[in-house]
């Protein structure tokens, strides 16, 4: 075989010229110790706080404690496969998650990976889970309502788009039910073509049983609400770091809508469990404990999350993110550490009580303790007009009911007040998964406050309401349409409603 020196030298020169010097450079450290979901790592000198790191077996973690000689990392997965001396490499990215409309209708974990078995999620955008809340200048005061479909809320503690309204109560008082009904009630606005009316929903489940989350997803699907909802689940069986992260993940997904001129509502169910997960992580990272063994920055944990809910002004797209955090109390103790923290951060609270729940008042809202500090400005004019007196009447009723237990000979005005109060309480009851359109709520509450149910037996109030509303829908649909389209309850509408209710009173017996 003929060997030509010139040819060989040309091949060698070509190879030298095209020699690739790109080596994969990544900063690598080694595990000093691992246990209880925490790894101590040596050698990651340039790691950032909140940065993702990757262990040799592919499990990810997040650097939280940056100390002089080592880094404390919380592990997003099982620590069983990680051992001392293993390599750990930096990813050089702060924890981020996929965001966008492709997530609607899906169930994801705290890192944004799908867990519903419907294949991968095609998103183009990612967003950091921890971002600064909008400043004061880009914000605008709350002025549009979030219709929950629950009479007790829309009339007495109205919620506006961009508000933070706490739902607080003991276990098994229907806190999640209030949130899910609010989601289901957005079905009609989300079916319209007007993007500015739509309200996308994000539900974050923290530390709940998987069966409970599956049940919630099933309820949303059956009621047609899943197609405009995202569910983020960090269940009880998952590591504490994922339970701590899940609310921030859901918030980042909700912020996508807020920052693109759309509207979203997010439910954190519940923040008590997030605080417990954060306490576990902090104690294992050897951070000093404070009150109830929570770390010193547990207030900041929740405030930086809830401050991200905002109504943006028109220069910034006019979008909004409404937050409905849920807190579970122990035996009605709202003065415990976490409940008082979250009450002071939010713009009002909806207080649910066990006693009311067992008396059959559902939703079990304590109207006296529940407030909405900014929602009044967002309430529709029609609802504001008819519900003005109901709060006062219910407050007087509760005060009188306490005294009425002692004396039997009550004067006529007190008797009237007690009768009206009992019927109004009955009127505010509502079964689960049956939110009511606001125009029907308006007529219903108008009937209650104007004496139309005073002569109806208490146990027939619900029957009266359902028959009256079906009468209005069939005979006086124009009244309902006027209220729905204008959002107002003008004198002519009022006169027509009075005439309709008088006509119905004759046939209801």
From Swiss-Prot:
Main subcellular location of this protein, as a coarse class: membrane
Enzyme type, top EC level: translocase
Keyword Ion transport listed: yes
Pfam family, one: ATP-synt_ab
Gene Ontology cellular-component annotations: plasma membrane; proton-transporting ATP synthase complex
Membrane topology classification: Peripheral membrane protein
Reactions it catalyzes: ATP + H2O + 4 H(+)(in) = ADP + phosphate + 5 H(+)(out)
Residues the record marks as site: Required for activity: 370
Protein EC: 7.1.2.2
CDD domains noted in UniProt: ATP-synt_F1_alpha_C, ATP-synt_F1_alpha_N, F1-ATPase_alpha_CD
Classification via InterPro entries: ATP_synth_asu-like_sf (IPR023366), ATP_synth_asu_C (IPR000793), ATP_synth_asu_C_sf (IPR038376), ATP_synth_F1_a_nt-bd_dom (IPR033732), ATP_synth_F1_asu (IPR005294), ATPase_a/bsu_AS (IPR020003), ATPase_F1/V1/A1_a/bsu_N (IPR004100), ATPase_F1/V1/A1_a/bsu_N_sf (IPR036121)
The entry's keywords: ATP synthesis, ATP-binding, Cell inner membrane, Cell membrane, CF(1), Hydrogen ion transport, Ion transport, Membrane, Nucleotide-binding, Translocase, Transport
Residue numbers binding ATP: 169-176
Domain of life: Bacteria
Signal peptide span: none
UniProt subcellular location: Cell inner membrane
Presence of the UniProt keyword Cell inner membrane in the record: yes
Functional description taken from the UniProt entry: Produces ATP from ADP in the presence of a proton gradient across the membrane. The alpha chain is a regulatory subunit.
Family recorded in the similarity comment: Belongs to the ATPase alpha/beta chains family.
Complex and partners: F-type ATPases have 2 components, CF(1) - the catalytic core - and CF(0) - the membrane proton channel. CF(1) has five subunits: alpha(3), beta(3), gamma(1), delta(1), epsilon(1). CF(0) has four main subunits: a(1), b(1), b'(1) and c(9-12).
HAMAP family xref list: ATP_synth_alpha_bact
Protein name per the record: ATP synthase subunit alpha
């Amino acid at each position: 075989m003929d060997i030509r020196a010139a040819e060989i030298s040309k091949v060698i020169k070509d190879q030298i010229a095209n020699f690739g010097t790109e080596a994969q450079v990544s900063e690598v450290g080694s595990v000093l110790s691992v246990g209880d979901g925490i790894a101590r790592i040596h050698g990651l000198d340039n790691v950032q706080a909140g940065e993702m790191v990757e262990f040799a077996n592919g499990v990810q973690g997040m650097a939280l404690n940056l100390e002089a000689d080592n880094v404390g990392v919380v592990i997003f997965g099982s620590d069983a496969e990680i051992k001392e001396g293993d390599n750990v490499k930096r990813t050089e990215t702060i924890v981020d998650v996929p965001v966008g409309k492709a997530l609607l209708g899906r169930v994801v974990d705290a890192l944004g990976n799908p867990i519903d078995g419907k294949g991968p999620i095609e998103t183009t955008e990612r967003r950091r889970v921890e971002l600064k809340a909008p400043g004061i200048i880009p914000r605008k005061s709350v002025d549009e309502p979030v219709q929950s479909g629950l009479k007790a809320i829309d009339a007495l503690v109205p919620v506006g788009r961009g508000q933070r309204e706490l739902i607080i109560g003991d276990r098994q008082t229907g806190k999640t039910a209030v949130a899910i009904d609010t989601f289901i009630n957005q079905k009609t606005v989300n079916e319209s073509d007007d993007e500015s009316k739509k309200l996308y929903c994000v539900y974050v489940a923290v530390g709940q049983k998987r069966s409970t989350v599956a049940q919630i997803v099933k309820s949303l699907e059956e009621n047609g609400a899943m197609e405009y909802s995202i569910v983020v689940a960090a269940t009880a069986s998952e590591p504490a770091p994922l339970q701590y992260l899940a609310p921030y993940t859901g918030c980042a997904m909700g912020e996508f809508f807020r920052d693109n001129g759309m509207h979203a509502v997010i439910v954190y169910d519940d923040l008590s469990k997030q605080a417990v997960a954060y306490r576990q992580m902090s104690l294992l990272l050897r951070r000093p404990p404070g009150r109830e063994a929570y770390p010193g920055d547990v207030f900041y944990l929740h405030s930086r999350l809830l401050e991200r809910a905002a109504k943006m002004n028109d220069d910034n797209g006019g979008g909004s993110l409404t937050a409905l955090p849920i807190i579970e109390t122990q035996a009605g103790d709202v003065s415990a550490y976490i409940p008082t923290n979250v009450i002071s951060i939010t713009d009002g609270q909806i207080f649910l009580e066990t006693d009311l729940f067992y008396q059959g008042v559902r939703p079990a809202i304590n109207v006296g303790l529940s407030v909405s500090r900014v929602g009044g400005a967002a309430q529709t004019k029609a609802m504001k007009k008819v519900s003005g007196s109901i709060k006062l009447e219910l407050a007087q009723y509760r005060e009188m009911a306490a005294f009425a237990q002692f004396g039997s000979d009550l004067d006529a005005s007190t008797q009237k007040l007690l009768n009206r109060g009992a019927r109004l309480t009955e009127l505010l009851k509502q079964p689960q998964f049956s939110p009511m359109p606001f125009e029907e709520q308006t007529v219903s509450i108008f009937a209650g406050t104007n004496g139309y149910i005073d002569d109806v037996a208490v146990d027939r109030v619900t029957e009266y309401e359902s028959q009256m509303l079906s009468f209005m829908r069939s005979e006086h649909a124009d009244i309902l349409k006027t209220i729905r389209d204008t959002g107002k309850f003008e004198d002519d509408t009022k006169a027509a409603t009075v005439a309709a209710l008088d006509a119905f009173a004759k046939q209801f017996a």
